[in-house]
Amino acid sequence: MPDLPDSVDDPRRERLCEHPLVKHFLGTPLHVLAQGGCGRKGGRIVRHVWNGGRPFGSVRQTEFGLDVASPLFTLLTLASSVSNERLIMCMYEMCGTFAVCKIAPQVKLALEQACGSRWGDARLGWENVRDASGNPTDLWKRPPLIELSDLTEFANKIQGLRGAKSFTRAAKCITGIVASPLEVQASMLFGLSRLRGGEGLRLTNNVEIRMTRSARLISGLDRRYPDILLSNKDGSRECLVECQGKAIHGSIESKISDSDRTTALQAMGYPVVLMTYGQLVDSDAFRVVMELIMSYLDMPLKDKTPRQQELERRLREEIFIDWAGM
């Protein structure tokens, strides 16, 4: 891959954007890490200028003729250029077991030629999530890029660097490992404080619940990892939220499996709320669901002040977006 010219007017910059790796895989705008203050912005190339030392392991070499920023350093460079809410979303994705990735037709064709029908198979590292009709989607399953412990450790190491305050503030909001954008959106609406537009509830993601004998007979599972576990302040009341995304839960088989798991958890005494995107994105419907959840938690649902309502509206504008275009 050719080097990036420093000058914004250098015609080689546009030719770089036509390179197959950029055009069909990385996409534009192309974000590059650079030193020096010249040419930070361009039509299809965005330079993230970083002068001075970088945290150890910030840059990794690849077999494609270019170096890339590590996931943690990528988040740090983003911290000073995106809202804290968007940074939280990026952290959830990198610490989670999913990715949203649009595959260009040329890349898909190359994958099909190399791997056949197995191009989206989990055995190749990333597993493509198919919709109810069996068609590929932009949602993928993959191992986490960042461990939660590494996120916290990195936040402690970067104090004083540009973007560190925003990074640390966002890292404190990550409640666990999630498996889809819907789980991220739900976790942020439930978990962020009312001063940030959320509901300020205590929650954890995908915590292990060991099934009782009766629950195992119903579900056929030894353990379950519910999407969201909500609890009241003293932990005496709990409520489970299962996010029902169309891509994962749309098929008949998935619905039957979800029903078995839900019944098994209810048999163990857990209230279970099945949350859809429609219920989450519609503020009035979300309020009704919140009333149900708070009744399970034996907590009053306090009305939001006009200021808190405005903060929730802004939060919703930040999180309900085209995730692939973020």
For each of these PLM feature ranges, what is it?
Residues 115, 119, 130-326:
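Surface segments flanking catalytic/ligand-binding clefts of nucleic-acid enzymes
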Residues 1-162, 301-305, 314-326:
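Short gly/ser-rich loop at a beta-strand->alpha-helix junction or flexible surface loop bordering the NTP-binding
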